[in-house]
Amino acid sequence: MNNEDLCFRSASDLASDIRARRISPVEITEAVLDRISTLNPKLNCFCTPTPDTAMDQARRAEQEIMDGRPLGLLHGIPYSIKDLQMTRGVRTMRGSKIFEHSVPEDENPLQTRLANAGGIFLGKTTTPEFGWKGVTDSPVTGLTRNPWNLDCTPGGSSGGASAQVAAGLGPVSYTHLTLPTKA
């Protein structure tokens, strides 16, 4: 299987292949990171990629498989987190110059759960400032582009995440949706 085919496989198919030892977390992560380094400059999906962290986690995940340890549901599966979510030790800008250099000490509980399930953290995806726009064009990182037509937007506020998954830059991205409620 070539790297492009690998990058467009679903998380559930990848998880099955990892458990069956047909493919390793390192192979998957290397393929995805290679694609990120090639396409992210054009698409601007990731505002803060974490390739070193991802490779460290992938090597650890692979060793756990070799050691016969119990595997989490996302063991070896690459994922990203929308930049509105706090991630301990990783810059969280919220798409705003106000927080351009913010590195939180706390993190969103789902980030902890994804890591505990064995996921491989690829980095933070772009979002418009504070997520309040239907186009992902952060004043810090610029415009995120649709991978199928660079003249179009992937939307917002999860434009980075949607472009990431559509372009095969990782099968999973944690975003969020805030809906207005009646008072």
Label each residue range with its predicted role.
Residues 22, 37-96:
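N-terminal, positively charged, Ser/Thr/Ala/Gly-biased leader segments
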Residues 35, 39, 57, 61, ...:
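Short alpha-helical functional segments enriched in proximate histidine and acidic residues
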